[in-house]
Amino acid sequence: MSTICAISTPYGSGGIAIVRVSGESAIQIVDSLFQGRKSLMEAGAYTIHYGELIKPVDDEVLDQVLVSIFRAPHSFTGEDVLEIACHGSLYIQQTLLQWLVDAGCQLAKAGEFT
């Protein structure tokens, strides 16, 4: 099964946007872009972690975020799910999606999260 990602908040700019990632590699993929106090791989279920999204290639910082972790099978999709709460500019949302795709996610199709 593939790991998917999508913006969960309505289209457009807002104060906060939520990007959801689901699948067997979700935690590894988000952890590869996240720098916080501890690795997301070591984090427990139903926890929230503050940190920065950093592009591994050149250490570019995109945003300060909160990442919520919901581990399988007790999540909305039954798989590992992470919700990334980032600032809501379209640039940040689209760049984050591109970074996730570059790291191994596929863009979710309409209805895949529901």
Where are these predicted regions, by residue range?
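A glycine-rich (often HGG/GG-containing) alpha/beta subdomain
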Residues: 1-114
